[in-house]
Regions:
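Thiol/selenol-based redox catalytic cores and closely related redox-interacting motifs
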Residues: 119-196
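Bacterial N-terminal signal peptides
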Residues: 1-14
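Beta-strand-centric surfaces of beta-sandwich/beta-rich domains
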Residues: 265-272, 302-352, 357-492, 498-617
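Short active-site neighborhood of thiol/selenol oxidoreductases, capturing the structured segment around
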Residues: 48-69, 174
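Aromatic- and Gly/Pro-enriched helix-to-coil junctions and flexible linker segments
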Residues: 187-347, 425-431, 436-438
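N-proximal helix/coil linker or "cap" segments that precede and/or mark the start of modular domains
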Residues: 12-34, 48-51, 184-186, 190-203
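A short beta-strand-turn-helix
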Residues: 35-56, 205-214
Length: 618
């Protein structure tokens, strides 16, 4: 099968039949013939030249959409599979502002070795009614559209993937067409990034109208630009008006759905520092701006550009920078990667840590990280046993933890006078979570460590609350796990870190004080393994001796859970791998009385019950 990557640089069209379709309107059953494209590698090409003798597949792609990039390898495999059966593949980039330079750079980065064109006038996109990248169209030998929609069911929503593909929709449609059978499913919804249609911004009708310069830009600066700027994790930038109007409809949708910015705790159940949750007024502002035609407004209303650290360290130059000892290679596509890397610290004395900051070596693939310490040498042994850099399983009991990082989060210094002990002669073990980007990548990330500059009065300890369920039965979509812990000494809680794996759905923790007062600690109703992090309270929460911390979680081990790592579902047991399951809530805290700290460490053994039928002690 000839793979013609038709990302149109300059499209000249001459359509003999078929008027343009409204974007999103079904074109299945319509006949498409007679257009010509400018192919920068081979000159002007007609549809007849591009079409396969048995069928033609047209797929719309984008350089900026990560979901689109993740399909480059699968599409190449599809091309190879049908090469000898008369099916050709045409890939078209319909986004106006992804010009020749950007497309050429993208082709080089992703090692695309085929002619590339761009549909600048969106003529082919309009012809087929395409609205999304990636979106596929299967056209038979007579020029009739027989299938349109997704390539497969890898994604269940924007950027949220299944653990494994369960239906290859485009491949099934091709097989049925070649076999002379009716197409079983002729149309599916394509999930991805919207094709950037031409926008003619309107002028503000009155002085009270919402404008980009006065109202919207500040929201983007405060809520979006941590990630949406060059060199960071987001696939596109939101630094100016031109970039914002390109993605405006998409921005409105994801903020209305609260998919972005990523913030999992529900409002009012715990009060946290640097909450990335948009206020209702901010969502309303964006919605009104889009509805009114996205006016730019008075240039004098534009706030000053947000300043970011030039050296990449948001807290300033660290006292110690710990860098992965080797580069790690991330494959182009496939499942996410969880990998541990050992970094020797090399101190012969204990150190007090007040803040840690993560700097991704490759922001395109680094998604989140957790920083453990190991004083036993066991992590080094596991590293030595694995031929690749790092190792793939935990396999050791960490001596402690000093923090973590997730996309979009800010480094969180500990409260004044507190610190985490970094044991002498220990190693840092960094657990990395990587997202494949669509092309082979390399990463060598670093962690900046800040030490206490004044005497530490309180040592921070992690208080684990375990939900001890050892089996998650297959087929059950609401598996309840409860756990509890009685606080042995007076403490102040400063943070909470929920942890479950792929089956997790909901996670809630509360603290019941000795006088019966119930304090909400955290509540997540749409758990996502890919977005776990530590949350720091705005103010430390006093938890007197005898306080009971309750944990309640729900998991889904059915086929209805798209994150289920097993297809079909099977019995899942407690364990360290993402294919196992866990349920733990870590409370970062300090003992009110320093003399009680070692009692806190000694008495923080888990007290938890598996299942709702076992009640905690009064």
């Amino acid at each position: 099968m000839t793979l013609i990557v038709s990302w149109s640089l300059n499209l000249l069209s001459n359509f003999v039949q078929a008027a343009s379709e409204e974007p999103g309107k079904s074109s299945v059953g319509r006949k498409v013939t007679g257009f010509r494209l400018n192919d920068t590698a081979a000159g002007q090409r007609s549809f007849g030249e591009l079409a396969g003798r048995s069928a033609t597949v047209i797929v719309f792609l984008s350089t900026e959409c990560p979901m689109s990039n993740n399909y480059l390898d699968p599409l190449a495999e599809l091309a190879g599979k049908y090469e000898g059966q008369g099916v050709k593949l045409v890939l078209i980039n319909p986004n106006r502002d992804e010009g020749q330079t950007q497309v050429a750079k993208h082709a080089q980065e992703f090692q695309i070795k085929f002619p590339m064109l761009i549909d600048l006038e969106q003529t082919v996109a309009d012809l087929l009614g395409a609205k999304t990248t990636p979106e596929a169209f299967l056209i038979d030998a007579d020029g009739v559209v027989r299938y349109r929609g997704r390539i497969d069911d890898q994604y269940i929503s924007r950027l949220k993937r299944r653990e494994s593909v369960t239906r290859h929709d485009l491949g099934v449609a091709i097989d049925e067409l070649l076999a002379g059978k009716p197409i079983t499913v002729a149309e599916t919804e394509a999930l991805g990034c919207p094709i950037a249609r031409p926008v003619v911004p309107k002028h503000a009708k009155d002085s009270n109208a919402v404008t980009f310069n006065r109202d919207v830009m500040k929201i983007l600066q405060d809520r979006c630009q941590n990630c949406h700027r060059p060199g960071q994790a987001a696939p596109f930038s939101l630094l100016n008006y031109r970039q914002a109007i390109k993605w405006a409809l998409d921005i409105e949708r994801v903020v209305t759905d609260r998919a972005m910015p990523p913030w999992k705790p529900i409002a009012g159940f715990g009060h946290f520092r640097d909450e990335q949750r948009l206020a209702e007024s901010e969502i309303a502002t964006i919605t009104r701006w889009v509805a009114s035609g996205m006016p730019e407004g008075d240039p004098n209303d534009l706030p000053p550009p947000r300043e970011f650290s030039k050296d990449g360290w948001q807290l300033g130059q660290p006292d110690l920078v710990l860098t992965m000892t080797e580069e790690f290679e991330i494959y182009a596509t496939g499942r996410d990667i969880i990998r541990q890397f050992v970094i020797p610290i090399g101190f012969d004395e204990d150190k007090w840590v007040t803040a840690v900051e993560f700097r991704a070596g490759n922001a395109r693939v680094a998604h989140h990280a957790i920083f453990f310490t190991d004083s036993t040498g066991q992590a080094r042994k596991l590293d030595a046993e694995d031929p690749l850099p790092g190792f793939s399983r935990i396999g050791f009991l960490p001596s402690g933890a000093i923090g973590g990082w997730a996309v979009g989060t800010q480094p969180q210094p500990l409260p004044d006078g507190t610190g985490m002990r970094l044991p002498k002669n220990s190693d840092l073990v960094v657990q990395m979570h990587y997202h494949p980007s669509g092309k082979p990548e390399r990463d060598r990330s670093a962690i900046g460590v800040h030490f206490a500059k004044s005497p530490v009065q309180k040592q921070v300890a992690g208080l684990p609350v375990f939900g001890f369920r050892f089996q998650w039965p297959e087929g059950d979509d609401r598996i309840k796990t409860t756990g509890w812990f009685r606080v042995p000494v007076d403490v102040h809680a400063i943070s909470v870190f929920p942890h479950m794996h792929m089956l997790g759905k909901e996670f809630k923790m509360t603290a019941t004080l000795p006088d019966g007062t119930v304090i909400p600690l955290i509540n997540i109703e749409d758990w996502d393994f890919n977005w776990q992090q530590a949350y720091f309270y705005k103010d430390p929460i006093p938890l007197p001796k005898g306080t009971i911390i309750d944990l309640e979680s729900y998991a889904d081990n059915s086929s209805r859970n798209p994150a289920n790592p097993n297809n079909p579902p099977r019995l899942v047991t407690f364990g360290e791998q993402s294919t196992n399951e866990m349920c733990i809530g870590f409370i970062g805290c300090t003992a009110d009385n320093n003399a009680d700290f070692f009692d806190l460490l000694r008495l923080r053994r888990p007290r938890a019950q598996a299942g709702a039928s076992i009640k905690r002690e009064p």
